[in-house]
């Protein structure tokens, strides 16, 4: 099903998917904001993910469960190479295509279409206009990797893309990397932002975001979600984890909090941590771009942090990294964005993608 969007180069699509994947048994219960604070403490403790403070998961993966989802996406441009964008935690697809006035310089989608690419920009399941799902049993990392795998197939077989690029930001970067590892022959290039390949610096993000139960935080907007969906406490907490002064316009942070920000399920982060990261299976040429002042990926200073990625992406035909861009975590929403987009397109051109 498609409809024409407000942008002439885009159509709104609804993509039905059937996903069969094993699930973890999440044993974290969040009923109210007191529980959200308690979970935050557990996730940021010095002994987190040790026997003294284990992941909130009971046992390993169970049997495969088959589920039907609908993914909402914008399909933009007519280029034979399709870029599939995957957003991060506390975000939506609007991160890649802001809809506020005078924001064209921040729209990766518009820049990519102008550069001759097509873009499949989607809301992850549980987010925005995609299927509402259970925050514990469906909102799990390995399920979302399989959703992206299915979208790669959609790009190739339904949208008839000749080449496919995966572009992931933050949590979406991990999803994109693992999807590229699983669908090696179908992915021609991989671009990662808000990503360092380690969660060593996860605690400042989790504590600084000020997690709150989304349905209590904004009942009119998120009252339909179960209590295991979390969001950030206010625009200033969001700014701390996503932006770096003086390299952004405050209106972009305000818009992100009011419009683009979307909750995440309590099962997503523990299952990311519990999943083996098979970065060594990625064969596609890979570009990693980092705002220097990224809190969650690098603890606030990324210079040197990406140096060890060569030890992880051992099979990538090309691995290029940039660790000192004047920006925070939400790289594309900083004033450096146009130059970042040019860097991405230059890299893809060098790889004949």
Per-segment meaning from a language model:
Residues 78-117:
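Short, surface-exposed "cap/lid" segments of acyl-processing enzymes
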Residues 292-322, 327:
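Conserved loop-alpha-helix segment in the C-terminal half of the alpha/beta-hydrolase fold
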Residues 162-198:
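Conserved hydrolase catalytic core segment
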Residues 318-353:
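Catalytic active-site module of serine/aspartate enzymes centered on a nucleophile-bearing elbow/loop
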Residues 94-95, 123-138, 329-330:
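Glycine-rich "HGGG/HGxG" loop immediately N-terminal to the catalytic nucleophile
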Residues 2-78:
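N-terminal cap/lid segment of alpha/beta-hydrolase-fold proteins
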Residues 137-159:
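Alpha/beta-hydrolase active-site loop
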Residues 54-55, 205-301:
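Alpha/beta-hydrolase
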């Amino acid at each position: 099903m498609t409809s024409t969007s407000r942008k002439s180069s885009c159509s709104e699509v609804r993509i039905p998917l059937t996903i069969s994947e094993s699930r973890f048994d999440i044993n974290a219960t969040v009923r109210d904001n007191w529980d959200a604070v308690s979970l935050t403490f557990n996730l940021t403790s010095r002994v987190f993910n040790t026997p003294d403070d284990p992941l909130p998961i009971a046992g390993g993966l169970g049997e495969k469960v088959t589920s039907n989802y609908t993914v909402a996406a914008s399909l933009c441009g007519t280029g034979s190479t399709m870029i599939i964008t995957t957003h991060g935690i506390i975000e939506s697809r609007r991160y890649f295509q802001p809809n506020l006035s005078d924001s064209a310089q921040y729209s990766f989608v518009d820049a990519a279409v102008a550069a001759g690419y097509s873009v499949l920009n989607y809301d992850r399941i549980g987010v925005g206009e995609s299927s509402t799902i259970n925050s514990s049993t469906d909102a799990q990392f390995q399920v979302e990797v399989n959703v992206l795998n299915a979208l790669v197939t959609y790009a190739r077989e339904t949208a008839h893309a000749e080449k496919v690029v995966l572009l992931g930001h933050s949590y979406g970067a991990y999803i994109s990397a693992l999807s590229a590892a699983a669908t090696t022959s179908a992915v021609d290039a991989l671009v990662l932002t808000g990503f360092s390949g380690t969660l060593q610096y996860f605690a400042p993000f989790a504590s600084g975001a000020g997690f709150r139960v989304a349905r209590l935080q904004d009942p009119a907007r998120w009252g339909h979600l179960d209590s295991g969906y979390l969001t950030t406490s206010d625009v200033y907490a969001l700014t701390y984890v996503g932006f770096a002064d003086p390299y952004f316009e405050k209106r972009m942070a305000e818009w992100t909090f009011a419009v683009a920000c979307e909750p995440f399920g309590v099962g997503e982060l523990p299952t990311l941590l519990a999943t083996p990261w098979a970065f060594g299976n990625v064969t596609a040429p890979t570009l990693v771009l980092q705002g220097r002042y990224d809190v969650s990926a690098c603890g606030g200073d990324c210079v040197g942090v990406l140096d060890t990625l060569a030890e992880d992406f051992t099979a990538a035909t090309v691995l290029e990294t940039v660790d000192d861009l004047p920006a925070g975590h939400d790289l594309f929403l900083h004033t450096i964005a146009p130059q970042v987009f040019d860097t991405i397109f230059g890299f893809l051109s060098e790889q004949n993608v």
